[in-house]
């Protein structure tokens, strides 16, 4: 509407191309901004989204205060995917957590030991991860009206940018 008032008309394809070019740049800038600002207690979980009618796994982690740690989309749900996620999270945050809380996914204990080290305490409890499960709702509610994705690349781009922007704009309560 702002552009129409000024006499500028863009085809839908141009807007989609801008998104494809600018979304990764925005995502990387926000990831760099987050480095070193993450707590030492992580909550990790995975959920699934539809891509071309198939289920693809979205690994997500937040810290104790609800700040985003990392997001990774994987076609498989196993130890290799969990290790890739923890490597990515360690690279993004620049630190190793003291404690990781997860549900009962069997790939997490081995991946945590292999990537983060033996000294990281791993808690397995379905109910302690509840605020992360609730956090999945934000991305699921955004994806549901779209009916899934047509390509894995667009799903990766969307999931990463959506969570990064949502984390950057969310209201925070600081402890005094």
Identify the meaning behind each predicted range:
Residues 1-176:
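Residue-level recognition of single "structural anchor" positions
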